[in-house]
Every structure is written in C-alpha cells, then in structure tokens.
UniProtKB/Swiss-Prot annotation:
Gene behind the chain: efp
Gene Ontology biological process terms in this record: peptide biosynthetic process
CDD domains in UniProt: S1_EF-P_repeat_2 (cd05794)
Gene Ontology cellular component terms for the protein in this record: cytoplasm
Main function: Involved in peptide bond synthesis. Stimulates efficient translation and peptide-bond synthesis on native or reconstituted 70S ribosomes in vitro. Probably functions indirectly by altering the affinity of the ribosome for aminoacyl-tRNA, thus increasing their reactivity as acceptors for peptidyl transferase.
This protein's record includes keyword Kinase: no
Name of the protein in question: Elongation factor P
Keywords: Cytoplasm, Elongation factor, Protein biosynthesis
Pathway noted in the entry: Protein biosynthesis; polypeptide chain elongation
Annotated family: Belongs to the elongation factor P family.
HAMAP family according to UniProt: EF_P (MF_00141)
Recorded superkingdom: Bacteria
UniProt entry tagged with the keyword Cytoplasm: yes
Length: 192
C-alpha cells in the first residue's frame, strides 16, 4: 500500500479510509485565498456501499490500495455459502452469506457454471461483479388478464434462479429473457 498526496488522488482511485476500502467517485480541487488547496472527495465504501464525503487539505495524505479482480466460475450454493472456482489457480473460494449480507441481492443473479469477477482486497471478497444484462430462462408465469392492454401491461414471471420480475404479457414459460442486473427489471426477450 502506498501513501499518496491529496493533490494526486484522482477519480477511480482506491483508498483505505477509516480502515475500509473506498473508490473515489468524484474529486474537486480548489485553491483557497492564501495559496492553500482543498480536495473534496466523494467516496463509496466497497464493503457496505455507503457513500461519504471527505475534505483533505493540500498537505494531507491518504493510503492508496490495490483492488484486484479474480475471474471465477460459480459452482453452487450450499445453504448460506456460495462456492466459486478461481479460473487461474482452480482453488475454491467460499463466500458465507451470513458474514457478507451485502451479497444477498446478487444471489438470485448467479447461475451455475457461469463466469463472474470477484472484486478482492487483501484476499477478501468485497463485491461480485455482474454483467449489466443477464440471460435467464422463464420457469413460471402469472396468468394474465386478456384484453388488459390499456397501459403497458405487465405480469410476474419467475426465472430459473428463483428471481421474480415483471415482464410483458407475451412472455411465456420456456422463453429466455435479459434482465438488467442493476434495476432487476425486464430488458428484452431473447429470440431463438
């Protein structure tokens, strides 16, 4: 870990703030009337996803850290433990959901044998990187009311991982759909 001056911190840098890894979302540099400088930072905690603001003086320093991505294959879920295999070393990485509650929202997006990236800091997984849109198979659909098309009519559908989303009335069991992983919303139907 390296120490960097506040004037050298840039957007996208990774810093250790109050013992937790953060990414710099915004950086604003301003000079004061007496020749001093102030750097205002907007930071996102990579563990709990909280956003904070910090102000550093020109002479202040911060601890830069290295975050790395491990390319992994999702193997299975055993009760509250997700098991991945590192594609470089073939080591298995277990992720206990009881200890990492912030991964709960990503569990329903994980599909066995698919490739993902684990964001790691100090040999600890701090995030699971998902693709912006993920393909799923529809396993169950809610009955739709015929003729209910005055507005953008939607119905609940259940996907192969158990995720339930709203989709247009024309979606049927067996269809493949793309889902936006950030908003958890239907994006489009995949044509065969």
């Amino acid at each position: 870990m390296a120490v960097v001056k506040s004037s050298e911190i840039e957007k996208g840098s990774f810093l250790l703030i109050k013992g937790a890894p953060h990414i710099v979302l915004e950086r604003e540099f301003s000079k004061t009337g007496r020749g001093g400088a102030i750097v205002r930072l907007k930071l996102k905690n990579l563990k709990n996803k909280f956003v904070i603001r910090e102000t550093l003086k020109g002479a202040d320093t911060a601890e830069a850290i290295e975050i790395y991505e491990a390319s992994v294959q999702y193997l299975y879920k055993d009760k509250d433990v997700l098991v991945f295999m590192d594609l470089e070393t073939y080591d298995q990485i277990s992720l206990d959901l009881k200890e990492n509650a912030n991964f709960q929202d990503k569990v329903l997006f994980l599909q066995e044998s698919e490739i993902y990236s684990l964001i790691m800091f100090d040999n600890v997984v701090i995030d699971i990187k998902l693709a912006p849109k993920i393909a799923f198979e529809v396993v169950e659909v809610e009955a739709a009311v015929k003729g209910d098309t005055v507005t953008n009519a939607m119905k609940n559908i259940t996907l192969n991982t158990g995720l339930i989303i709203k989709a247009p009335l024309f979606i049927n069991v067996g269809d493949k759909v793309l889902v936006n992983s950030e908003t958890k919303e239907y994006a489009e139907r995949i044509k065969n």
